Amino acid sequence: MTWRDEIARRVRGEHLRDAPLAPRTAVRVGGPADLLCRPADGDALSALLGAVRELGVPLSVLGGGANTLVADAGVRGVVLRLPQDFPGESTDGDTLVLSAGAPIARLPARAHAHGLVGMEFLGGIPGTLGGAAAMNAGTRLGEMKDVVTRLELATADGAGFVPAAALGYAYRTCRLPPGAVVARVEVRLRPGDVAASEALMREDRERRRATQPLDRPTFGSTFTNPPGEYAGRLIEAVGLKGHRVGGAVWSPVHANFVTNLGGATARDVLALIRLARARVKERFGIALETEVRLMGEFPPDELAGLDGHAADGGGPGAASGGARPREAT
């Protein structure tokens, strides 16, 4: 019996072998996963985490595929993806407990259905809630740390809620314990004017359509903004706005967005990222940091010059590049 057979035997849920990952990411790039698993519920999730630990199988976590670059060679081991309808959602007054696999786009409307506001900033963010919570996703309207009160973290030994205050939330990051997976997210909102909230979200969507390349596959922002600066302005200033490598390009609409013009590879995308980091560092002395999570087996030459990048693709405590498993949006 192979390790894939053993995991399928132990873990209730969906198991897809050699599953293409490019269609499951926002930028539409990357190779297949050895095994893509969608556990049926919390017990099945803990069973999966226990199985990969016992069998020594690498584990990566994929949410909606935003801010994620999968290696051209794909991802060895298990890629975990929580179902959208993962059990355990609830509402109690101004507090909602939501599945980490829930698409972000539907959450403001759910809050509005209960007369609650405060999630307007999620209206323009792709991906899933778990990934957004794990990386403290946000926009000019707010960020996840403004509303998250607790995360339910699953491990091989079970699951439990951890207060947001214990997770070290900061700009586009939080500190998840090694080997933990976000299963559910608790948010606290406030009663408010739903019509005004919807109008604010419509206005923000129109602004994004006018200033971002939303007609092409893209991560969203590639680099975080340095203190007091904008990554897009720096990339444009070094002459890379519209610069193309293979099927990938620094968007002529917004220079901090890599877009896939068709047939782009992870190698193409990383070449653009390395070039931008090098030129900005040389001219401005600023080391740009990526928002993009790397998942899978990347050749060393593709990672050269990407010190400090976030890596996925290994197992609990031993992800690709030596990092722990992370939730990707």
Swiss-Prot record:
HAMAP family: MurB (MF_00037). Its cofactor is FAD. Residues 311-320 have a biased composition (Gly residues). This is UDP-N-acetylenolpyruvoylglucosamine reductase. Residues 204-225, 303-329 are annotated as: Disordered. Pathway: Cell wall biogenesis; peptidoglycan biosynthesis. Its main location: cytoplasm. GO terms for biological process: cell division; cell wall organization; peptidoglycan biosynthetic process; regulation of cell shape. Its EC number is 1.3.1.98.
